[in-house]
């Protein structure tokens, strides 16, 4: 994430005399992201963080995975080209309902976990 790596974009921006904007970042290590944000700031490039909440740590607020979430994911990734495949893959509906309701509850901001490393990598502070 160095200036040299994005120099072609910087030259283009300068040649057309228009601002440059990085649509989204957030899918790398905290160290890489911190260096990349610094490079963009030093070169007057705006950027957006992606996304606000997720299940892992590449976000501002982490969502705790509810019990049986692995079954929800297994169903979502199972073959469903035929009715038989759908029926064969269909998990217990009460377990799935509870897992989905728990996910909704865990997604509320007050139940999320601040991802301090990610936040610091963007040059921001946690209060």
What residue ranges belong to the model's regions?
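Substrate-binding cleft of secreted/luminal carbohydrate-active enzymes
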Residues: 3-126
């Amino acid at each position: 994430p160095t200036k040299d790596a994005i120099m072609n974009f910087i030259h283009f921006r300068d040649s057309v005399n228009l601002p440059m904007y990085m649509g989204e970042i957030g899918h790398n290590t905290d160290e890489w992201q911190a260096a990349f944000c610094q490079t963009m700031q030093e070169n007057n490039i705006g950027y957006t963080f992606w996304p606000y909440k997720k299940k892992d740590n590449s976000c501002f607020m982490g969502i705790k995975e509810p019990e049986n979430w692995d079954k929800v994911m297994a169903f979502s990734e199972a073959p469903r080209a035929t009715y038989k495949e759908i029926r064969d893959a269909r998990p217990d509906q009460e377990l799935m309902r509870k897992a989905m309701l728990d996910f909704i509850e865990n997604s509320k901001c007050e139940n999320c976990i601040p991802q301090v490393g990610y936040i610091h990598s963007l040059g921001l502070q946690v209060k």
